[in-house]
Amino acid sequence: MFGYVTLYRKGLADAEMDRYQAYYCGLCRTLGRRYGRTGQLALSYDMAFVAILLTALYDTPTAFSEGRCVPHPLKKRPRADNELLDYAADMTAALAYYNFLDDWQDDHRRASLAQAQKLEPSLPALRERWPRQLQTMAVQLDRLNALESAGSHDLDALCNAFGALLGEVFAYRDDIWAPALRGMGNGLGAFIYLMDAYDDLEKDSRRGQFNALQQLADELPPAAYEQRCHELLTQQMGRCAQQFEMLPILKDTPEGKLLYNTIYSGVWSKYALVRKHREAKRHD
């Protein structure tokens, strides 16, 4: 479901892209160090965004360096290392475990079961380190699975379940910034859930699988459906942006530039691609 919280690359200078790459590569290395190859398989732009956001908010000391890795053995790449990349790696591993388990339960993919089993020994330590976040993950994913299994098309309930999950991930500490971070994560989580449904509509329809937007697609003409989806996505990103603006993050800092780019431009990149592809197919 992750992979929608990306940059608008044309809006950034080379130095800013290097800074982003440092966090992304840093998260990959941290996942490898803490969870091995299975953890690295779950690497996402979304959790790199969480690390950048929290680093900027808490002004966390960060070590930057360069180095080679197995996927990129020839050219050195920028790397970042700090405690919030450790946190993002922990959240990535926990979410990956539940995702692999869900894939196994839904489709009986043996590869997914094997990956879940590799991460399972890490769960007790994760629950001990982050009890609030892990408890919320379990509760909200159970809630989401129950809604989807029942064939619910209550978009508010579906979006709120995933939004509450991501909101708790954003709330690194239970401090003065936690309400804004939770609100931001709620809006972004709802956007991600809707965007995933929007992206997968045709595939889910072919396979006879649940899709939160299927009823809307069945009830509305194509143009009205597209307009309504855009309205829903805009509403959720508006909630996210409103809460983001309450945080003391300066737009002209290196991390601030990446965050503003992502929230106001980058998240719409995949939407634009999916909509363009769908409209092209419609006119073939």
Regions found by a protein language model. Give the residues of each.
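Acidic catalytic motifs of isoprenoid enzymes
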Residues: 1-183, 190, 194-234, 238, ...
